Each structure stands twice: as structure tokens, then as C-alpha cells.
């Protein structure tokens, strides 16, 4: 096996997704240790990143979700320290965290995305409701794990929802409702893995459904996708990742409309690795267990 030296599993951090990061990090740490890797937990909220060098770490497995973790900040710090790390580089991480600018790139390249509008204090909210229709989704551009995602149903409600959300990270986006199903497709080292059909018991795949409930159904391989649709989803996931320069292990989320058309929703350049997480479920279908998946991701560690 490749010699990774002393490995820091970066977990926790400062964002609203701290607890999820700790859960993922603990699972990864245990998996790496089970494979004989000299791995240790490292929480930047408790210990400055500069201590990585002082403590002799040679590789970083980054599982810091959200702000300062997957937005390019910690990636830049690791570049300066010269420590190889897993995941995407600075630019791709920053773009992937910004749903608005990621959508602009995908649109420019002709990839299918749901129609959307960026909201501001002076937005004509009635006009946006008319353009996108109801219901619609409203979300902050730079939060993850469905933090701040609201389904707007009632006419005239858009402005008040915007006022509730505008303190969150990034622009606030209103997005056309696509009602044919929710899917996700991981990409590992430029190769699409089996897609997952997500069937939440809640109204949509929100934070509660992702992390706290046990009644969300995950179909992998998906029972309602034809072979051609599955192939297209994987192709679009790979193209979506390549469009922003994402590397290593990422996950692209999709919506399907009632006519069967697939839309790229967003990309997660640092997907979760908990017992509820989608990437391990998809990898398992291909015969790759959790510990082996962690090793494959660790092999992608890089600088620059």
C-alpha cells in the first residue's frame, strides 16, 4: 500500500455543518485505522492549521464541510503549508460551494439546470413568482446540507422568505420546482458511480431527511431509471464536475421532471461520509466497502 505517512483527518471546523463533519470524520478515521493508516483526528476549531506541520502530519484527509472547509479557504492554507490533501483545489472548491456561480458555469456550457433567479432587497418578488411559478424553492447559495432551503407555496410569500434567509451565506436563489424525483450521482477520479434515487418521507430531501430520519428510501441502483437515463446521469455528473475543475470524490445532485429530463441541481465537492451518506451507498453497489473507499479517496491527496 502507498505510504501516506502521518495522516490528519480534518473534521469539525467552524461551519453550521460542524456536527455532520465530526460524524463523517470519525467514520473515516476508524476506517483508515482499520487499514493500518497512521491517522489522527484534527479539528481546526481546537488547533490551528499551522500545527499540522509542527505535529509532523504528511497528508490531510479533508472532511470539513461548509464555510472554511469546502469553500477554498482550508485548501489554500494546505497549499501554503505544502501538505497534500484530498478533494478539489482552491478554485473548484470555491465555485462548488457557490451554487449561483456554479450554475452560471453549467449554463454557459449548455448543461441543463433548473430556471432560477437571484433575489435582492429591490427584487420585484411578484414578477419572480410569476416567472418561476409556485411552488418554488428558495435557498442560500453558500450553505450546504440543505441548511436554509425553503419550499415556497403561497402567493406573496417569496419576499418574507427572502427576508428570513438573507443573513445566510451567499446570494439567495429562487429556483423553479422540478417535481419528477431527486437523484444523486457520485464521481470518483473522473468516473461516474451508480446513481441513487432519493425518496424522502418528508416533503423534500431536507436536513432532517438527510441526517436524522431513518425512513428516507435510497434506491441504488435506481429502479425508475432506464439504462440510458442512468448512463446519461453519470455522463452529466462527470461533465458537471469537470466544468468547475473538481477532483477526487464529488457528488452531483439531480432533479428529474415529469417528462424524464434530468437537471443538474448542485455539486458537493466534499460529500458526507456518515452512515446516511450517499457516496458510500453508491460505492458499495460496485463492490467497494467503506474502508476501501476511504483509501481510494486518500490516494487522491495532492498539492496544486
From Swiss-Prot:
Q: What class of enzyme is it?
A: ligase
Q: Which residues bind ATP?
A: 129-184
Q: Give UniProt keywords alphabetically.
A: ATP-binding, Cell shape, Cell wall biogenesis/degradation, Cytoplasm, Ligase, Magnesium, Manganese, Metal-binding, Nucleotide-binding, Peptidoglycan synthesis
Entry's SUPFAM superfamilies? Glutathione synthetase ATP-binding domain-like (SSF56059), PreATP-grasp domain (SSF52440)
The record lists Mg(2+) 1 as bound by 253, 266
Catalysed reactions, semicolon-separated: 2 D-alanine + ATP = D-alanyl-D-alanine + ADP + phosphate + H(+)
Question: Superkingdom of this entry's organism?
Answer: Bacteria
Q: Which residues form the ATP-grasp domain?
A: 103-299
Q: Does the keyword Magnesium apply?
A: yes
Q: What is its main location?
A: cytoplasm
The pathway where this protein functions is: Cell wall biogenesis; peptidoglycan biosynthesis
Positions bound to Mg(2+) 2: 266, 268
Give any Gene Ontology cellular component: cytoplasm
**Compartments where located:** Cytoplasm
Concerning Pfam families, the annotation shows: Dala_Dala_lig_C, Dala_Dala_lig_N
What GO molecular-function term can you cite, just one?
metal ion binding
> Which cofactors does it use?
Mg(2+); Mn(2+)
Is Ligase there in the keyword field? yes
Q: How is the cofactor bound?
A: Binds 2 magnesium or manganese ions per subunit.
An example GO biological process term is: cell wall organization
Tell me its family: Belongs to the D-alanine--D-alanine ligase family.
Record protein name field: D-alanine--D-alanine ligase
Organism, per UniProt? Neisseria meningitidis serogroup B (strain ATCC BAA-335 / MC58)
Q: What is the lineage of its organism?
A: Bacteria, Pseudomonadati, Pseudomonadota, Betaproteobacteria, Neisseriales
- Give the gene name: ddl
Amino acid at each position: 500500500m502507498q505510504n501516506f505517512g502521518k495522516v490528519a483527518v480534518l473534521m469539525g471546523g467552524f461551519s453550521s455543518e460542524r456536527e455532520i463533519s465530526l460524524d463523517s470524520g470519525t467514520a473515516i478515521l476508524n476506517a483508515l485505522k482499520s487499514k493500518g493508516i497512521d491517522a489522527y483526528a484534527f479539528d481546526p476549531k481546537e488547533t490551528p492549521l499551522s500545527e499540522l506541520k509542527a505535529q509532523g502530519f504528511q497528508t490531510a484527509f479533508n472532511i470539513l464541510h461548509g464555510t472554511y472547509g469546502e469553500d477554498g479557504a482550508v485548501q489554500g492554507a494546505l497549499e501554503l503549508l505544502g501538505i497534500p490533501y484530498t478533494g478539489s483545489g482552491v478554485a473548484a472548491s470555491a465555485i462548488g460551494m457557490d451554487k449561483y456561480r456554479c450554475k452560471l458555469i453549467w449554463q454557459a456550457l449548455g448543461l441543463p439546470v433548473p430556471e432560477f433567479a437571484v433575489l435582492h432587497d429591490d427584487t420585484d418578488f411578484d414578477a419572480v413568482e410569476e416567472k418561476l411559478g409556485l411552488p418554488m424553492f428558495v435557498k442560500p447559495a453558500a450553505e450546504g446540507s440543505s441548511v436554509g432551503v425553503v419550499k415556497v407555496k403561497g402567493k406573496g410569500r417569496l419576499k418574507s422568505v427572502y427576508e428570513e434567509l438573507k443573513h445566510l451565506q451567499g446570494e439567495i436563489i429562487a429556483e423553479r420546482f422540478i417535481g419528477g424525483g431527486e437523484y444523486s450521482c457520485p464521481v470518483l477520479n473522473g468516473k461516474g458511480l451508480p446513481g441513487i434515487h432519493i425518496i424522502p418521507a418528508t416533503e423534500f430531501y431536507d436536513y432532517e431527511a438527510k441526517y436524522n430520519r431513518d425512513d428516507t428510501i435510497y434506491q441504488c441502483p435506481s429502479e425508475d431509471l432506464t439504462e440510458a437515463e442512468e448512463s446519461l446521469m453519470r455522463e452529466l455528473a462527470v461533465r458537471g464536475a469537470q466544468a468547475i475543475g473538481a477532483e477526487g470524490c464529488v457528488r452531483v445532485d439531480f432533479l428529474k421532471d415529469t417528462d424524464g429530463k434530468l437537471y443538474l441541481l448542485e455539486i458537493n465537492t466534499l460529500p458526507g461520509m456518515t452512515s446516511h451518506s450517499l457516496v458510500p451507498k453508491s460505492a458499495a453497489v460496485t463492490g467497494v466497502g467503506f474502508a476501501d473507499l476511504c483509501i481510494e479517496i486518500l490516494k487522491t491527496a495532492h498539492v496544486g
